[in-house]
């Protein structure tokens, strides 16, 4: 298994190919490799982790969508949680299920992650160059860092009428 080399971060695919010992045409924008299936996800499989370069790994799930969710969770266990993922689907059930189990702060639906994550007037996310990854990624916020995060605020707090809810109201059937 390999590890990320500093001289391969954010370089052209041509330079990346040269570092790996082969050549690609000058007009290519990235290198794509097949990752296979879930059997190729793990710390010992370099292509299943974050690369920070012009290399795209394509993994295929087989059978039910649940298998894709299992693979996604395995990849986040290897590559780190919190940042983002994307789904190209029109199936609202698939999108919802991904949203319920993906340990990420943003999910791009039918849009490129690299542009969508940083915010856009076409997706409602505030523009940023700094993305919070929540406690999944060791951050305090899980949203795009924007102007509101740099503004000092002062809370003026006054006593409120105290209306203590009953245990039944708080815990419902779990209180029995």
Task: Please state what every model-predicted region is.
Residues 21-176:
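Conserved C-terminal structural/oligomerization subdomain of aldehyde/semialdehyde dehydrogenase
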Residues 1-17, 45-53:
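Flexible, acidic loop-helix segments that line cofactor/substrate-binding pockets
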